[in-house]
């Protein structure tokens, strides 16, 4: 009796759940766009087709079917896209998220009794077995359609009306399994043992989040006179130059008032001269803070003219969002609870022991600062959005709380989904990836320090094939005001051309800091820093001086703009080149109508001769086939015969090659 009571107890309140569980025979797992169990949104690009995949399977041998459903968040109607079987229980659908917005995604899967019946009866018929009862089962399956439209209902009724028990079995089966019947049943047959997956978040960025070319400058150094502070009007005069190079994002270091307390002098000196402008990252003075403009740059009227002029030149302005304050920032006086104070009553300066940053004070995100500081920082971003800025490069986001970024980016993008955040986070891999998960549309990367063939292949393979490709988009900056790469310090003009080609063609997003075009690389001895860095002084640049590489930059950006193959970073593929100093890789559209092959000599000091592989198999061609080739550096056209070819790349004349491949029958 006790055992019976126990069994009854286990049923109490659980029968409904049991029945739901029993009905869920189709398993859905391994979803490619599911990030941490749906905790974070996968990133896609609005208007781009994306492959949505999942492992879907059932017990036994019955056929199954599946569909992806998606909708824009806040709307009622789902858009259904049927999935196709790939291999090994993997299913796929191609989905386009039309709007730059938050979306939702889910899956349905079910046992397909009609297809199961059709396959089984076909086998029995082929074996010469009687199928009379099976045909009756087929009639009942056809009669079971419940959601048929008028056309499908009429088709099913016609098939049933034409069927008769006195007819030949093969003819009856052919009628019940005709292509028209199969299509109708796919649309409207009952979905037996329907399994519904959880709803997953998706964020569809605008294209600039995945494909952009950045040019970084300090507005104060654009007067062409090292003795005169630049203005926004000076920047406006430089816009044609930036656009002529082919860039589409013009990124400014901070444009706010600079603190006077503990101001840094040239080369980060602690003893500035009276006319030293200080570091733009020491934000805030009696003239204002993060929502103010440095008075020597201009005012909001001139900034508005700059934004408008940039748009007219096909450029977007990106601003630096640096959450740090100079010791005389207004917030310190108005909100002392937002900062750390030492036992002696002095404010704590920014430190990374043993380094000290005497001209910078960090905010504290908790204690008395929560929630008011969080609101204030969000409102700073929204303030600049209203001024026409839709892209923000965020300084050192890895030193601020993940919950803050998740909340702040969500707040901003809920109102302005076209806003893009770039994480300047040279940090540990997992931290960098977490920032992508919490909302950053782009991230700085380790590209700056990946110089060898093996390093580049390993790193790029990780970024383009592992799960992080669905939430972290790298931006390959070849240099920054803070990083003067060792490779460039010792490689001369050839090295600048090499790293330009790699950054521009490997990445969907890439950037250059001004001075790159004239191969500026004078270092502070023994450091990855620029000597006479314009972080601490005004500079005047002669970008037309002998040895500049403007033509290379124009060419790279032209190839990026005019070839659809360049847009999707994840379509990067590496190929064989029998030389450890040569990197071979390709990008193509899915239909292979635009197929580019790249060879880059990574050695800036010596010519390299090598045998390389022509990826004929990508076009379904045998190893002895031929392809027509266009050299995108000079426009020459010729034919490669066979899978292996030879090439020499001399870093002094031609450190890289870009080929467009045309398979037989492709339009020229």
Curated annotation (Swiss-Prot):
This is Alpha-1,4-glucan:maltose-1-phosphate maltosyltransferase. The lineage of its organism: Bacteria, Pseudomonadati, Pseudomonadota, Alphaproteobacteria, Rhodobacterales. GO terms for molecular function: hexosyltransferase activity; hydrolase activity, hydrolyzing O-glycosyl compounds. Keywords: Carbohydrate metabolism, Glycosyltransferase, Transferase. Alpha-maltose 1-phosphate binds at residues 264, 324, 359, 396, 535-536. One of its GO terms (biological process) is alpha-glucan biosynthetic process. CDD domains: AmyAc_GlgE_like. The active site is at residues 395, 424. Homodimer. The keyword Glycosyltransferase applies. Belongs to the glycosyl hydrolase 13 family. GlgE subfamily. It catalyses: alpha-maltose 1-phosphate + [(1->4)-alpha-D-glucosyl](n) = [(1->4)-alpha-D-glucosyl](n+2) + phosphate. Maltosyltransferase that uses maltose 1-phosphate (M1P) as the sugar donor to elongate linear or branched alpha-(1->4)-glucans. Is involved in a branched alpha-glucan biosynthetic pathway from trehalose, together with TreS, Mak and GlgB. Gene3D superfamilies: Glycosidases (3.20.20.80), Golgi alpha-mannosidase II (2.60.40.1180), Immunoglobulins (2.60.40.10), Phosphotransferase system, lactose/cellobiose-type IIA subunit (1.20.58.80). Its EC number is 2.4.99.16. It comes from the Bacteria. InterPro entries: GlgE, GLGE_C, GlgE_dom_N/S, Glyco_hydro_13_cat_dom, Glyco_hydro_b, Glycoside_hydrolase_SF, Ig-like_fold. Residues 263-288 are annotated as: Disordered. The record marks 482 as: Transition state stabilizer. Transmembrane segments: none annotated.
């Amino acid at each position: 009796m006790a055992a019976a009571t126990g069994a009854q107890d286990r049923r109490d309140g659980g029968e409904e759940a049991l029945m739901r569980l029993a009905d869920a025979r189709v398993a859905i797992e391994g979803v490619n766009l599911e990030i941490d169990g749906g905790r974070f949104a996968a990133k896609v690009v609005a208007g781009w087709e994306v492959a949505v995949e999942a492992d879907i399977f059932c017990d036994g041998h019955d056929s199954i079917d599946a569909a992806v459903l998606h909708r824009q968040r806040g709307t009622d109607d789902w858009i259904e896209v049927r999935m196709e079987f790939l291999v090994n229980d993997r299913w796929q659908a191609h989905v386009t998220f039309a709007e730059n917005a938050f979306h939702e995604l889910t899956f349905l899967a079910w046992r397909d009794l009609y297809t199961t019946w059709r396959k089984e009866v076909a086998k029995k018929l082929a074996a010469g077995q009687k199928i009379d009862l099976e045909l009756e089962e087929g009639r009942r399956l056809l009669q079971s359609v419940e959601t048929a439209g008028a056309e499908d209902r009429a088709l099913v009724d016609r098939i049933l009306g034409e069927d008769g028990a006195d007819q030949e079995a093969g003819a009856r089966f052919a009628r019940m399994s005709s292509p028209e019947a199969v299509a109708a049943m796919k649309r409207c047959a009952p979905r037996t043992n329907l399994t519904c997956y959880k709803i997953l978040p998706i964020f569809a960025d605008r294209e600039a989040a995945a494909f952009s070319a950045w040019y970084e400058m300090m507005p104060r150094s654009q007067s062409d006179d090292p003795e005169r502070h630049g203005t926004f009007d000076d920047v406006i005069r430089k816009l044609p130059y930036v656009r002529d190079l082919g860039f589409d994002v013009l990124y400014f270091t901070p444009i706010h008032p600079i603190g006077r307390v503990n101001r840094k002098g040239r080369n980060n000196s602690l003893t500035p001269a009276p006319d030293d402008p200080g570091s733009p990252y020491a934000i805030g003075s009696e003239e204002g803070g993060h929502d103010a403009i440095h008075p020597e740059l201009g005012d909001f009227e001139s900034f508005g003219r700059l934004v408008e002029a940039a748009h007219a030149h096909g450029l977007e302005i990106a601003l630096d969002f640096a959450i740090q304050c100079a010791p005389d920032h207004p917030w310190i006086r108005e909100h002392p609870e937002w900062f750390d104070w030492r036992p002696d009553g002095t404010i704590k300066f920014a430190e990374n022991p043993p380094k000290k940053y005497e001209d910078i004070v960090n905010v504290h995100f908790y204690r008395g600062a929560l929630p008011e500081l969080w609101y204030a920082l969000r409102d700073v971003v929204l303030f600049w959005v209203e001024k026409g800025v839709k892209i923000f490069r965020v300084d050192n986001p890895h030193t601020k709380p993940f919950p803050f970024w998740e909340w702040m980016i969500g707040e901003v993008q809920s109102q302005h989904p076209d806003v893009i955040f770039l994480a300047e986070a040279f940090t540990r891999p997992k931290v960098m990836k977490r920032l992508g998960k919490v909302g950053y549309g782009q991230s700085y990367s380790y590209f700056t320090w990946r110089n060898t063939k093996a390093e580049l292949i390993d790193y790029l393979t990780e970024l383009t094939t592992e799960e992080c490709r669905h939430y972290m988009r790298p931006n390959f900056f070849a240099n920054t005001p803070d990083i003067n790469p060792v490779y460039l310090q010792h490689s001369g003009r050839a090295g600048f051309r090499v790293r330009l080609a790699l950054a521009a063609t490997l990445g969907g997003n890439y950037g250059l800091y001004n001075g790159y075009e004239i191969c500026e690389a004078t270092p502070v001895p023994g450091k990855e820093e620029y000597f006479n860095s314009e972080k601490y002084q005004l500079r005047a640049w002669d970008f037309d001086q002998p040895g500049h590489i403007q033509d290379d930059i124009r060419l790279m950006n032209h190839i990026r703009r005019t070839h659809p193959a360049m847009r999707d970073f994840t379509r990067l593929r590496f190929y064989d080149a029998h030389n450890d100093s040569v990197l071979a890789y390709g990008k193509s559209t899915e239909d292979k109508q635009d197929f580019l092959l790249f060879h880059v000599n990574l050695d800036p000091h010596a010519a390299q001769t090598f045998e390389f592989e022509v990826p004929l198999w990508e076009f379904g061609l045998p190893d002895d086939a031929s392809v027509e080739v266009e050299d995108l550096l000079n426009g020459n056209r010729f034919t490669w015969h066979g899978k292996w070819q030879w090439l020499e790349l001399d870093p002094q004349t031609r450190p890289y090659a870009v080929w467009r491949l045309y398979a037989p029958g492709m339009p020229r």
